[in-house]
Amino acid sequence: MKKNIIAILFLFTSCVSTKTQNTYTTLETEIDYYTSDNTKELDFPFSDATIVNNVIYVAGQVGNLPGNTKVVPGGIKEETKQTMKNIERILVALGSSMDKVFKCTCMLLDISEWAEMSEEYKKFFAEDKRPSRSAFAGSGLALGAKIEIECWAIR
């Protein structure tokens, strides 16, 4: 009887170990890096976006014209509009679009400009397809910008 119980416990333990090993099997994940010619020319130390498992991670963008290190004039609304155009340009180059964005993070130099930024930002998304979003104030944004936005999208 003891031998039967030991045999059953051994069999049960063997099954659990096999299942655990299968659960932790990992596959190598490929990372694609996208850097536009404009970003290469400016010698920025980052990619415009990385793609992992069909998810596009767009690096923080500011309201500069492509190939230029100065943000557009006109304040938070104009900077936000140009920032969103920069994000859209990257997504389109990667075969995606703004309607596939599911998460954004907005960093503002001055949080009191949140409403003005949001007014321009929401123009880039269908009302029923606005991504989840976080926004906070930070100092020292890239290129002296008032706004920097990063996004995640499906390819």
Residue ranges and their predicted role:
Residues 15-85, 89-94, 109-155:
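N-terminal presequence-like segments and the immediate start of the first folded domain
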